[in-house]
Amino acid sequence: MESFRRFSLLSFIALLAYFAFLASAEHHVHQFVITPTPVKRLCRTHQSITVNGQYPGPTLVVRNGDSLAITVINRARYNISIHWHGIRQLRNPWADGPEYITQCPIRPGQTYTYRFKIEDQEGTLWWHAHSRWLRATVYGALIIYPRLGSPYPFSMPKRDIPILLGEWWDRNPMDVLKQAQFTGAAANVSDAYTINGQPGDLYRCSRAGTIRFPIFPGETVQLRVINAGMNQELFFSVANHQFTVVETDSAYTKPFTTNVIMIGPGQTTNVLLTANQRPGRYYMAARAYNSANAPFDNTTTTAILQYVNAPTRRGRGRGQIAPVFPVLPGFNDTATATAFTNRLRYWKRAPVPQQVDENLFFTVGLGLINCANPNSPRCQGPNGTRFAASMNNMSFVLPRSNSVMQAYYQGTPGIFTTDFPPVPPVQFDYTGNVSRGLWQPIKGTKAYKLKYKSNVQIVLQDTSIVTPENHPMHLHGYQFYVVGSGFGNFNPRTDPARFNLFDPPERNTIGTPPGGWVAIRFVADNPGAWFMHCHIDSHLGWGLAMVFLVENGRGQLQSVQAPPLDLPRC
């Protein structure tokens, strides 16, 4: 009898805790109106595509356990879809967003409501358009706080400052893309980088709009840094101030201090900053980290960290006190970029798979398509070719008549094939002098199937075809553990012995070292069609992508949900 009472009491307490959890979760309803908006930068006004007339778009703030319903109303002249970058979308690929992968795009005049739940995630993520180059101006922060009463693994500051790094073209980005697609050449590089949508003091007609962040002496703030740029890894620093890194891609890290961070497109990094310097004005700045032998935007964007009540003028008639400028690494400082990345560690012992069921090896890199007429205006790449990119020599082509996920769910043939190779079809010296016969990839819409709950390891190997380069690879629907990396060709006999299987960093986007490799592991516990691609949008457009098809497990709770009734049609 006593044991029954004890059991009943424990059950009652558990039930109360469950209802308290339900009561603490909120449902957020938003409306995203996609519309052209006049935006003036670099002395000129452009009709930029925005959300709710804002550039950058609105910041979404939620807690772990909350749910969202975001209705996207497309009043622009382009097809669009929205991706909630880093949200796992468990069993719900219909809300993931990449056009022609998990949904057909939202056409002009149409509406679609993304419905999803935040499940066991917290930290800094973001959202952006996933339709061609619309994400150049259609993006915003997505901040997930812990459940009420849940602690942080570090002393949490009272104030957050979202820092969205972007790129700006002095013309319509869709026209930049259209020109590159026609000529086969590389797209024109951006004309400016931005911090929260503003280029900063170093660009023409930009000083008045420079973002200023007030801070009190002695105050510690958390900077939530997001690289929303299209095509460029960036170094970021604040003059005379140190950062304490505490999170990357919504996963906590063992804290460490640094003067500079390197952040690739798609990645997020949270840092703590304490105002412990002489009261004044200090530039925060971002400039390119460029590991490729290719043109890039070699400008610098700035904002100002301004101590409250600090003097801003030298005296009557003597002008303003110029902000202190940070020392940034050189644009090609791979040593600094690598040293930063190598210091990242998961904040505690990580639940990384110790054994693997799927051992995959993917080459990632550029390529060239030969032209029958090298003098054609459509063949203005190197030596009369067209640029391409591939994984395992397969250059991904988006379908047009249906999305991969819809075709997979409905069993519709002819949209994709499941013969993406698990290893390169031809093995070669990946980082050496590669024969020109291996520079031309094969085009196709190819996917690779994974069994539910299989332990997956992928080695991503950069190649020297065209140029070695840091490729920020993003996997939809998953977080993964970065268990190892190195330069040169991956050695399957010796390199795994150096893997970190204790506290590897957890990410959703990771760069391949230029001329090197990176190894990741994850458990395939989220059924559906999940895009894996380079987050440099030029490379994605050239085909540096593939799709994983993760099969259903057993029963409803291990299977993909039914598609929503308002899912857009092609």
UniProtKB/Swiss-Prot annotation:
Chain positions recorded as Cu cation 2 binding sites: 85, 128, 535
Cofactors that this protein relies on: Cu cation
GO molecular function terms listed in the Swiss-Prot or TrEMBL record: copper ion binding; hydroquinone:oxygen oxidoreductase activity
Substrates-to-products reaction catalysed: 4 hydroquinone + O2 = 4 benzosemiquinone + 2 H2O
The keyword Transmembrane appears for this protein: no
UniProt entry tagged with the keyword Transcription: no
Tissue spec. comment: Mostly expressed in roots and siliques.
Function: Lignin degradation and detoxification of lignin-derived products.
Protein name: Laccase-3
Species in which this protein is naturally found: Arabidopsis thaliana (Mouse-ear cress)
Record lineage: Eukaryota, Viridiplantae, Streptophyta, Embryophyta, Tracheophyta
